[in-house]
């Protein structure tokens, strides 16, 4: 029902458009009433004047004012349509309403009846969208069918040239442009009007009237058993046969269903090219004009029965549906491709923008890189100059350090030499101290010896003086005693002489001791000087190798010859050592 409704709407659209004089999409209510009445008549739909008047009343409460004409058309007409009306009569009524307004005034190579058939074929082949157009693929299909029906070869190159000159702003042709294209003879050059008209009629019969095959054949009668020539017309559910091809005198029908079959028969009774059509209640024997026609009819009937078994539509409708689905698929693919292309274009534009942004960024980066490279080179030059300066300074510092190291090495060597010298000085100082100690011991011994000699000398002097006094006293006492005293004097003089000699000897020994003492004193002074000299050297060297410290606050010892060459602690240590030696002696 949906397909039938779509086909009916195409014819109604033409009629409605013809009534829309100002192309505003609106038609007067009186005209719509007339159109609706005519549609109900040709479509054999019960006509309800009350519903019609209710729908088209003058106030604004009716459905037309709110929803337009389509709701009424669907509800009151199209939904009630049955497949029992005359399609040709319906199309002719719609054609009558629109032909005068739209058909070209240019002279055509075809009749108005042929133009009507082209118009109906257009509605069959047009796309299911409004305004109605026929696309170039369907135009090519129709022109091929017409050319084939005229018995001439198809000029594909001519059609390709036509498509090249086709208006790119349009997706296809309108019904009136298609009529003008067929009627101007552009694709039927060399053909007479009758041939073109026959071709249009043949294509019309196939596409619109569902005529699958037609032609003259001889049929055997059922009652009289005679053979009579009839004009046979094969349709999807029926084979009708007429007296002639004008279809005015119909003689009967052969109803086809899935249980029918067709068989080839051998020649008999002088009849050739026989075949048999078996139906549920009847069998029909038919004779074709030749074997080719026989085979074509058998094949056509067999294909029709096979389609009935499958429940498939006629081949031309199925082919139309396949072409539409293919175009729909191609259109969807094209739309998808266009969408993808648009997305790709957008993506490309985005990419271009991104690339432009990247290019700008790269240019900026290149500029920054160049600037940075310039700065880097400048920095590198500065760094190289600084590095060279640093290198020179480092070399100078290294040289200075090497010199300092050499100097320090030299100073260290000198320091080590001074240390060695200081060690030698310490040893020599030790030896000098030992010599001084020995000299002091010798001095002490000589001093003690000298003191003892002085004591002995003093004792001898005292004794001599005593003897001298005694001698003087003895001289003064008596002369007698003088002799004795003389003797004693002589003895005493001898003794005195001996004492003098001893005294001289002692004096000599004292002088020797004094000389020895002077020698020892000189040696002691020399040792003291040597000790002082070594101490000064040691102090000097020690001052070179040790930190400067506060000087000692201990007072120097004073001897007969000046400041002592030793400290109080050293003196105490030596006194302790002398006492220990005395104790051991």
UniProtKB/Swiss-Prot annotation:
Location of the PH domain: 210-306
The record's account of how the chain is modified after translation: Tyrosine-phosphorylated.
Gene3D superfamilies reported in the protein's UniProt record: Pleckstrin-homology domain (PH domain)/Phosphotyrosine-binding domain (PTB) (2.30.29.30)
Pfam families, per the entry: PH
Keywords for this protein: Cell membrane, Cell projection, Coiled coil, Cytoplasm, DNA-binding, Membrane, Nucleus, Phosphoprotein
Record's subcellular location: Cytoplasm; Cell membrane; Nucleus; Cell projection, Lamellipodium
Molecular function terms, GO-annotated: DNA binding
Keyword Coiled coil: yes
Coiled coil segments of this chain: 316-532
Database matches in SUPFAM superfamilies: EF-hand, PH domain-like
Cellular component aspect of the GO annotation: cytoplasm; lamellipodium; nucleus; plasma membrane
This protein's record includes keyword RNA-binding: no
InterPro entries: EF-hand-dom_pair, PH-like_dom_sf, PH_domain
Documented effect of changing residue 291 to A: Abolishes binding to phosphatidylinositol 3,4,5-trisphosphate and blocks formation of membrane ruffles
Role noted for this protein: Phosphatidylinositol 3,4,5-trisphosphate-dependent guanine nucleotide exchange factor (GEF) which, independently of RAS, transduces signals from tyrosine kinase receptors to RAC. It also mediates signaling of membrane ruffling. Regulates the actin cytoskeleton as an effector or adapter protein in response to agonist stimulated phosphatidylinositol (3,4)-bisphosphate production and cell protrusion.
Domain notes: The PH domain is essential for phosphatidylinositol 3,4,5-trisphosphate binding.
Quaternary data: The SWAP complex consists of NPM1, NCL, PARP1 and SWAP70.
Protein name: Switch-associated protein 70
Organism the protein comes from: Bos taurus
Recorded name of the encoding gene: SWAP70
